[in-house]
Regions:
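Structural motif
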Residues: 22-38
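Short Pro-Gly-centered beta-turn/loop motif in secreted/extracellular proteins
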Residues: 35-39, 61-68
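A short, solvent-exposed loop/turn motif at the edges and junctions
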Residues: 45-46, 70-83
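Short, acidic Ser/Thr/Gly-rich low-complexity loop/linker segments typical of extracellular
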Residues: 48-59
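Structured interaction patches on ligand/partner-binding surfaces of diverse proteins
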Residues: 52-53, 79-94
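Conserved "repeat-terminator" motif of extracellular CCP/Sushi domains
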Residues: 94-104, 109-113
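Structured extracytoplasmic
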Residues: 113-265, 272-278, 340-342, 346-458, ...
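Exposed, low-structure sequence patches enriched in small/polar residues
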Residues: 371-491, 495-826
Length: 826
């Protein structure tokens, strides 16, 4: 099907509505009455779904076959201009001048007995038809063109800024285009929310900004929806002026009425009642039909807590398609912003053509793939783009492409590659200390990563001071195959134990998550298989706070695993492992500070009150042959297919994981004999409209055969001790001890967290500017020795940082309470 679409697309060359033997260009400039350009004015051919938009200079172009046409020129604030055009056997030049709209106040049919502003009655009629227009078109297909440009309009005079200006190829005044992009795609839609886009061509120059959209689905904005939501722009949505509850958020004022092509168009000012969640600007309504004709709205950082931009102007133009059905021809984000003294502006423009309403799709057409990127999409040449783009480039944009294309061509030369490779791979001590060091080959197919130097030296009470060396080598064969090898060396100076292991992963089918795993060697694992604290943080808590939270054991192991997506949304994983496991004891008791109210605890987590040099038995030395498998079901799994592989998107529905683990007795001397099964239901993002979003995780399990198993085989929980917690992961506890409640009996745990996404703080002026997100949550656990454990917490977060206060209970008795913080590390 994809190949078929590519053939159709190439034959049509994007925006050709009636393929004929020869096409000619209708081109010109659109100006106002002062002969100033009208940027982004809409142009379309009457009785067709073929349209375009002028560029920033008011220049436009069409490709038309010989014949007679009626072209309509439109832009918000100007009278619609209708021009008859005849294309013969040559290109036609047509400059068009638009005159200002003169909206006049007059009687409005919708007014009736409403004594308030007539706009109120008009908007009631529009809102009453909101759902009808939202669901009017059951399906359609179209061709989409997306263009984005970001300009640096001024730069600071610092040395760093000058270096940045050179990097961005700005002029001597620190101005210029830092990023531009174009894309062409086919787009398909079916009610209620099925979409599929096929990327045919893509071109960009510069680094993609954080506020960036280059695919059609990013700009499929429908104001008939209750909320206007743009990923990355804000942690919450904004109320549409025609939302079901719009009168709670807006008042309206009729500015006047004009007649366009025999239809009355009302210009209505949108006035927010609150300083958040709402637009300002104007919306244009077609009387009698009571539908949106166009929108010209704005959001500001000061009132709406926007990310990345200071202002965002949203414009949309509707045109008739057929049978009185109107759909958007063009959509535009126009923005301004500043960061570190750099001031910038830009826009994203979307043009929709070749609408085919009520299209019938194959039953399996919407299979979960919402975007398919053709392998040739990034390889289209200048001739293709010169013919296919519906909006002409400005002189500055053409020059920017040429400059950056020449730089890209330079990068193919060996000398350039060698110099850039040397610069990129230069070892820098401070980044290596904290983030590690990554070096890549000239081709980018080979890479070597050295883990952070900060993790190289560690301390715990079992090994004393130790050395931990870890690296990862990766090689990519092609877009579908790669492998990685991670060797690790570890030595404790107190217990004199040397560990060495190798973890390998071979990806053979990236598109279907097909992988093999092979791991073997010796290590010092955490008794809690979910992990408790990193080597680094356990070192800090041990030496500074005299709290040795992590408990270790010795494992000499080997395992092999496999995973693959069986069908879309069903992932299967299986592995079998063999390990010789030995209990370990404390051998070192160093610390920087001493505390009268606490001391180091035993490495036996079930003997918390034993002395630090305790040698009580937690488990005998044993051998374990273990089989583990799970199947994860993601319903209506959506994904993006790129040449480099498959990208899975968060599910709109709960994800279900069924897990089974078997301790196999008697084979290779294995001592274990148990069967464990669990069921997990989770969802990371549950939208709650203007009130933010929720997440939850519920897990239940049991050992239905528990003849022989040891502490590390138990079911463990992601507990927390100390002052740090992880609010970004719903599934962890705030106050639960790491090991105390690990169980070989039935258990049930539940976690819930709600993020209000600023819905509360946005109403408090001083707090609003901080962009804080309000968090509330609860955790629950029921198992044999702890049948009714619960936690409740509330707090704030911003990006990866957070702080909250919580309290926990065992039954009706308060257990622990206090503050927890998180700053990106655990």
């Amino acid at each position: 099907m994809i190949k078929f679409l590519l053939l159709i697309f190439t034959a049509a060359i994007v925006f050709n509505t009636n393929a004929r033997a020869q096409q000619y260009v209708l081109y010109g400039n659109i100006t106002d009455q002062q002969n100033k350009p009208v940027p982004f004015a809409s142009v379309y051919i009457k009785n067709s779904s073929y349209g375009s938009t002028a560029n920033e200079n008011g220049d436009y172009l069409f490709k038309l076959s010989p014949g007679s046409y009626v072209a309509i020129y439109r832009f918000v604030g100007y009278k619609e201009r209708v021009v008859k055009i005849t294309i013969t056997n040559h290109d036609e030049h047509m400059n068009v001048q638009l005159s200002d709209d003169l909206f006049v106040l007059a009687d409005v049919k919708a007014k009736k007995n409403d004594l308030s502003d007539p706009a109120t009655a008009i908007m009631r009629r529009v809102i009453s038809k909101r759902e009808y227009y939202l669901n009017e078109v059951k399906s359609y297909s179209s061709v989409e063109y997306i263009k984005g440009v970001k300009l640096i309009v001024s730069s600071p005079k610092t040395l760093l800024a000058r270096e940045m200006a050179k990097l961005l190829n700005l002029d001597t005044a620190g101005r210029g285009i830092s990023y531009q992009s174009e894309s062409l795609s086919t787009f398909s839609f079916e009610q209620p929310d099925k979409v599929k886009e096929v990327f045919i061509a893509s071109k960009s120059a510069g680094s993609n900004p954080p506020f960036g959209y280059n695919k059609a689905s990013d700009l499929q904005v429908n104001f008939y929806n209750n909320l206007f939501i743009v990923d990355g722009l804000s942690s919450h949505g904004f109320v549409s002026p025609v939302a079901a509850r719009a009168f709670t958020y807006y008042t309206y004022k009729l500015l006047g009425t004009i007649v366009q092509d025999g239809k009355k168009i009302d210009k209505i000012q949108v006035i927010p009642k609150l300083n958040a969640l709402a637009f300002t600007g104007c919306i244009y309504i077609m009387e009698d039909d009571w539908r949106i004709y166009s929108v010209d709205l704005m959001l500001t950082k000061a009132k709406n807590n926007l990310n990345f931009v200071d202002t965002l102007k949203v414009s949309q133009q509707y045109i008739p398609i057929k049978n009185n059905v109107w759909e958007p021809l063009s959509f535009q984000y126009k923005y301004t912003g500043s960061v570190q003294g750099f001031k910038y502006s830009g826009y994203y423009l979307g043009i929709t053509n070749n609408y085919k309403i009520d299209t019938t799709f194959r039953k399996d057409y919407f299979s979960g793939e919402i975007l398919h990127v053709d392998t040739e999409a990034n390889k289209r040449d200048a001739a293709f783009w010169a013919y296919s783009r519906p909006v002409p480039l400005t002189t500055a944009e053409a020059r920017n492409y040429k400059t950056k294309d020449s730089i890209s061509g330079l990068k193919e030369y060996t000398v350039y590659l060698d110099s850039m490779h040397h610069a990129d791979n230069k070892l820098k001590i401070l980044p290596y200390l904290i983030k590690g060091y990554l070096t890549t080959s000239i081709t980018g197919k080979d890479s070597l990563y050295l883990y952070p130097l900060l993790q190289t030296v560690y301390y715990n009470t079992v090994e004393g001071y130790g050395i931990y060396l870890r690296a990862r080598y990766s090689r990519t064969f092609d877009d579908n195959r790669s492998y990685s090898i991670t060797p690790t060396l570890r030595y404790g100076f107190a217990d004199k134990l040397f560990s060495a292991n190798l973890h390998t992963t071979y990806t053979y089918d990236q598109a279907h998550a097909g992988k093999f795993f092979l791991n073997f060697g010796s290590d010092m694992p955490d008794l809690n298989s979910l992990g408790t604290r990193s080597l680094y943080f356990n070192t800090l808590s041990s030496l500074i706070s005299e709290q040795n939270f992590v408990k270790y054991y010795r494992s000499e192991f080997g395992d092999i695993g496999y995973q693959r997506e069986l069908v879309n949304g069903v992932l299967w994983y299986a592995n079998i492992s063999y390990a010789n496991r030995t209990q370990l004891y404390n051998t070192s008791f160093n610390h920087i500070f001493s505390y009268s109210d606490r001391h180091y605890t035993s490495n036996n987590p079930l003997a918390p009150n034993a002395p630090e040099d305790d040698r009580s038995i937690l488990f005998p030395q044993n051998k374990a042959l273990t089989f583990n498998t799970f199947i994860k079901f993601t319903f209506d799994q959506q994904y993006i297919t790129r040449p480099t592989g498959k990208i899975y998107l968060p599910s709109k529905y709960p994800v279900i994981t069924v897990n089974y683990r078997k301790g196999i007795n008697g084979v290779l001397g294995s001592d274990v004999d148990y069967d464990f099964a669990s069921l997990q239901v989770e969802q990371d993002y549950v939208p709650m409209g203007l009130l933010g979003h929720s997440a939850f995780r519920i897990t239940a399990g049991d050992f239905f055969n528990r003849k022989t198993l040891y502490f590390m085989d138990y079911n463990h929980f992601l507990g927390n001790q100390g002052t740090t917690a992880d609010p970004t992961y719903v599934g962890s506890f705030h106050f639960l001890p790491f090991y105390t409640f690990s169980t070989a009996d039935p258990f049930f745990e539940a976690h819930y967290q709600h993020n209000f996404a600023g819905a509360l703080f946005d109403n408090i002026p001083l707090l609003k500017k901080l962009k804080l997100e309000e968090i509330v949550g609860a955790n629950y656990l029921s198992e044999k020795i702890n049948p009714n454990y619960s936690e409740f917490y509330f707090g704030i977060k911003r990006l990866i940082y957070g702080a909250d206060y919580g309290v926990s209970y065992q039954g009706n008795k308060k257990y622990l309470q206090g503050f927890r913080i998180f700053y990106g590390l655990r």
